[in-house]
Structure formats: C-alpha cells, structure tokens
Amino acid sequence: MGHRIAKPPIARIGALAVLFLGIVLYCAVPTAGWADETSAATEPAPTLAHHAPSNVPQGYVITPFGYFHPSCVRTVGRSDILLADGRVQHANGTRSPAHACGYARYTKSGSRIEPGMSAAPGGTPPAAGANRPPRADGWLEASWYHDKAPFGGISANWLVPSAPASDAGQVLYYFPGLEDYENIVSILQPVLGWNGFNDHAWTIASWNCCQGGNVDHSVPEPVATGDLIVGKIAGDCAAGQVCSRWDIATIDKTSGRTSTLKKTSSYGQTFDWAFAGVVEVYGIGACDQYSSNGFVDFTQVSLLDVEKKHICQVRWAASGLLQDGAPVCNYGVTVTPTSASLTF
C-alpha cells in the first residue's frame, strides 16, 4: 500500500533497517469465517495529499500504493467483481468498461511512474532540489516471509487502536498482505485506515492495484477504537491450484461490518511473499501523530499453502524501515509464533 520498496526486503532496508528473525511453529491456528456485508456506508474519496513531496501535483490523493490522481482511484461496489482486464462486473450481469488511468502516479518518496509503467524499479525520482518534508511517509514497519512455493491465503486479527493525539491530516494504514516476490505489480491488502478517506476517523477497506494504472478498493466501512478486525485473503480456486482470483475481506467482528473485494484478479502474479502485519503512514511529523496507544498487535496470524492448509513452520522476519526525517519515536517489531507486534 506506490510500492514503497522495489527489491527484496533485506536489500532494500539498508543501514537503517532493524532486522529480527522469528521461527513460527504452528498448525491449526483458528481463522475467522467470512462475514456478511450488512451496511450501506457512504463512499468518501481518499484523503488529499497535503503533505506529499513537492513534485506531486495538487489534487492527488493518498492510497496504500502511493499518490494517485483521484480519477484513477475506483470504488468497487459490494456486489461487484473486479475482472482481470480492469472491467467491473455488476450483480445484474452488466460490465462497466475498463478505462486506463491517464495520469502518472507517484511513490511515497515522490518518484514519478508514467501511465502504463510498472512500479518497479521505482519510477523517475524527484528533480534535484525538490523539497521532501521532514516526516515519515510510506512503509514504517513490517513482518514478512518469502517462500519459493506460492501461498493459498493469509489471515490475521488486530484491534482498532486509539486515534492520534494530534490530527495534522496524516494517514495511517495497518494490514497483513500477499505480494509476488519476483513480479512486483500489486499487493492484496485488507486494510484498517485512519483518515484514509478524508474522514479523520477509522475505516476498513480491501485494496488491489494497479490494473491500467488504477487502484481499486471496496466500499469503506466505519469502525471504532477497540473493535476486533479480521483481515483475510483467500484464493478463489480449488486446493492445489495457483489461484488467478482472490477474495479480500476486512471484517469488523465487533460490529459485523465487512468490506470485501470478491474474486479480484491476481493480474498474473504468484503470491509467494506474505506479510503478517505492516504499518504504513503518510504525513507523520511528530510522535503524537501516530495512534496514541503506541502499538498495533497482529494476532492469530495464519498462512496457508496452495492446498489451503495451515503452514506449520514459517520463518518470519521483522523489519524496521525507518526513513530520513522520521520523528524519533518508540519504534520496534517483535515476532512471536502467531503474532507480530509493531510499536511507534
């Protein structure tokens, strides 16, 4: 949620990374089932990028994939299906045509990615002398695992943390996810966000990117501090197959609200890179602009193989991805057999 890194994590982190390894030995981790979608929330637009690098044009919005023109951010309705060619199939069987995004997008550091270009290796960097605010933007902390064999799904639980003590228009994202280690096009993400839709509040939504340069998300749903969130990504194919379609659900078990992307395409990717938990932020200039409780814990993390069975041995890595200019706060990542705790 643009891509914040363009090489395998250890190579990307560099001297600022803090790397911890944990061996996870577990089978039969309980996972949450699919919940029914019950609400009819409004569909607000993502937050304007007020704190973006100076070369990002006015009017662009923040997404978990970087900065996009608002016309290239699409809401997929509750009964709709996002097809592999970018069209949207509606409940009545009709299909909306796919329109490629005609605008460049920008990574969290301000690198420009032209329409039709992949996010790797990172786009055109900002011109010399372009101002970058002294703040944290992009991936901050992550727990991840890569295997040569593809995965069949992942799920994790976490609680909605406290709102930030200081509201400066910043955006916070928390999520597990799946990505293709060798073919970085997108990442499937069930996301909890604060101010993700210009609302200065907590919401959940499920995301996929970037067919035709567009970024797609499900209808966001409001949630509250203390609610139990379940993020679940499941391949929509038979056991033993590498799925081309996926269901992404972000579920509030406390309220019953669910925000789901159904049967969304893999866009030709094979998901062999898993994230137990990630903190991604935009516009953070001080420690009191993070969630005021200072941490998020992802628990009951369950990674599935292509047979849709729980993987009994996972070598999780925990990484701190500190950036130049980030405020000095209580950063840390701790991996336990079934959880990832991220502090800030």
Features from the language model and the residues they span:
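N-terminal secretory signal peptides that target proteins for export/translocation
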Residues: 1-11
